[in-house]
């Protein structure tokens, strides 16, 4: 399906090039070269991070609230998506994304003080499904510099052993140096993710025990460094690596631009 969507967008390029209304207000850019207004791209994104537990409940007789401070949670996410974008204004790009996400979250319950004959161990939550969302980028540039801010909202339609829901809001500030087809930049990721999982786990001697857990990112920001290269005015790629504050991120993008 992804290949069909990309092919359809590329076949539509000649028609878009013939008469494109975007970007609007292009005269405010003066004699600066603007990118072609339409883009279709492929993103590959990975995220490793820790979580805090907002709430955790087990349906066990005689068990009340659980001390979540003794629980460690690790999360790994892998996402690939197709991104469609348009420069509505010389400084404003809007986009939509659709793709596939998979992840695994390990909730270490071994230190939870519950009156059970054996420790709880680790609750492993695996999920996969479709991810969709959208966002916008504000960008300003001089002859050899640029700055931008991108905001993205995504929601996932997931399948797995449990009833799962994942929502995420991301902000990406960047500032960089322009040198011909190359752009070198520093930035970061502010990622606010909420995961909710409901289901049942098998405990020795107790059988199937229902649970309900809500998770939040425990460190919302990490810095990043990246590089962009423009092969032609149609083809461009970006690589961005981030780390710090208990989080690691990787982004690889290839975009085909058309119209103008």
For each predicted feature, which ranges?
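Short glycine/proline- and aromatic-enriched beta-strand/turn motifs that initiate or cap beta-hairpins
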Residues: 18-81, 85-86, 96
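Extracellular loop and loop/strand-boundary signature of outer-membrane beta-barrel proteins
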Residues: 27, 66-70, 117-124, 157-162, ...
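Outer-envelope beta-barrel architecture signal
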Residues: 34-40, 90-92, 143-147, 169, ...
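Residues that define the transmembrane beta-barrel architecture of outer-membrane proteins
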Residues: 36, 76-80, 126-132, 155, ...
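Residues on the lipid-exposed face of transmembrane beta-strands in outer-membrane beta-barrel proteins
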Residues: 42, 82-90, 96, 134-140, ...
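Transmembrane beta-strands of outer-membrane beta-barrel pores
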Residues: 44-50, 98-104, 140-144, 151-157, ...
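Outer-membrane beta-barrel translocator domains and adjoining extracellular loop/strand segments
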Residues: 52-59, 105-113, 158-165, 196-203, ...
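Outer membrane beta-barrel transmembrane domains
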Residues: 183-260
